Amino acid sequence: MAIIGILGTPYNTVEQSPFWWNKVSYTRQSFIDVFQDLGHTVIILPVDKTENIKNYLTLVDKIVLTGGADVSPYLYGEEPNAKLGTTDPIRDRFELATIKAALEANKPILGVCRGLQLLNVYFGGRLYQDLSQTSSQIKHLQSPTPQEIPTHHISVEQESALGFLPENYMVNSFHHQVIKDLGQGLTAIAHGNDGLVEAIENKEKHVLAVQWHPECTWETEHFDKKIFEIFANGTI
């Protein structure tokens, strides 16, 4: 059994907050459910002072970076684009420091959506701040289609950590930022039909990340469940 540390998503917008004006750190229940279904324990790690990170890491075996706000373009040397969404510099700093500490402690990391993007930036890569900067014709922000429904195809490298996926696989999609330049030491292991990166890995450092949201589909798509299984069971 592994103890999985999921970095919490800060909810800082108190106006019309469902939490009665309280700031909170939360994660999707589906992240908790999939790991518990696989027999593992989950701890939600709140965004906190960076000096507390090493203490948090003593409590967990692995780290999960989830979705949420856009990654600040200042982290990769760009000014904000007009179509940049909400950013959270405090979360950015905390999660980047957590990535650094987790790598130093040899703790495996799984990134989902924003988590993939932030890992890419950590390793020196850059992002497209908005899909309008690309030539993609795929609807990567699939709303109002429900999140449980896969909507576009990806091609998967069969010699990668995701080699158990069909070579031509369908995923859901809820993002408007994507990788532009790949970070040093990272390998792109899945692409959309538009050529955009959909998954990355660094085998040496036990890093795996996907652009889609397998936590939304694991109950109906057994291949998506297996992503969490191989991560939790230590096969990446």
Swiss-Prot record:
Keyword terms: Glutamine amidotransferase, Transferase
InterPro entries reported in the protein's UniProt record: Class_I_gatase-like, Peptidase_C26, PuuD-like
CDD domains on file: GATase1_2 (cd01745)
Database matches in SUPFAM superfamilies: Class I glutamine amidotransferase-like
Gene Ontology cellular component terms for the protein in this record: cytosol
A GO MF label: transferase activity
Matching Pfam families: Peptidase_C26
Matching PANTHER family: GLUTAMINE AMIDOTRANSFERASE PB2B2.05-RELATED (PTHR43235:SF1)
Name by which UniProt lists this protein: Putative glutamine amidotransferase-like protein YvdE
Organism: Lactococcus lactis subsp. lactis (strain IL1403)
Phylogenetic lineage: Bacteria, Bacillati, Bacillota, Bacilli, Lactobacillales
